[in-house]
């Protein structure tokens, strides 16, 4: 899980979602998991 000031899609399978007022990226590739923080 990467914590970044700006999250973006790293591949076409990345999905941007919002959980508990946090913007997150979920993907089939675990290296692409990100959270805005």
UniProtKB/Swiss-Prot annotation:
Gene name for this UniProt entry: rpl36
GO molecular function, one term: structural constituent of ribosome
Gene Ontology BP annotations: translation
InterPro entries: Ribosomal_bL36, Ribosomal_bL36_sp
Cellular component GO terms, alphabetical: chloroplast; ribonucleoprotein complex; ribosome
Protein family membership: Belongs to the bacterial ribosomal protein bL36 family.
Location in or out of the cell: Plastid, Chloroplast
Principal cellular location given in the protein's record: plastid
Domain of life: Eukaryota
HAMAP family assigned: Ribosomal_bL36 (MF_00251)
Keywords, sorted A to Z: Chloroplast, Plastid, Ribonucleoprotein, Ribosomal protein
Pfam families hit by this protein: Ribosomal_L36
Protein name (record): Large ribosomal subunit protein bL36c
Chloroplast is among the record's keywords: yes
